[in-house]
Amino acid sequence: MADYSVTSESENLRLQMRRMMDGLHVAMPAKVLAFQPGPPVRVTVQPATQMKITLGEEVSYRSLPQLSGVPVVLPFAQTAGFLLTVPIQPGDTGLLVIPDRGLDNFLQAGDVAAPPFYGDPTLIQPRGHSLTDAIFIPGLSSDAVEIADYSTEAIELRDRERKSYISLGP
């Protein structure tokens, strides 16, 4: 049987930090379950990673919960009014980014959000690294998804096999 006893204060601190980091969410891959073209544009996703659960000496893993109403990040020059949209469908994958602070104030006001001072009645919720604040960036894929004939000299709008494309280059 393994000995899990803590031998020093520094070892105890390292163990506590590891446990804290295990629960910290920053970014992870996710799969689209549903797409709502809006307004506002949102997805329902299933995070493609699992959570480690340690109870004493037992370690198990479980899926993170589905997330609905997740904002989608698209290239958007707001002041010029230009936007690039892409078709998003169930089964597509991308990157979930979990912000340092809650997005409620920013999403509602559309401007710079105040810092999360605890006890401030103007703030909805002063939380950080919460899955409820995730944003989705479409396009992250596994190495199994091949992109044929990738151009290193031009910007292209194309299908994966490059059968249909528009190329802008020097």
Spell out what each predicted region is.
Residues A2-P170:
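Hydrophobic packing positions characteristic
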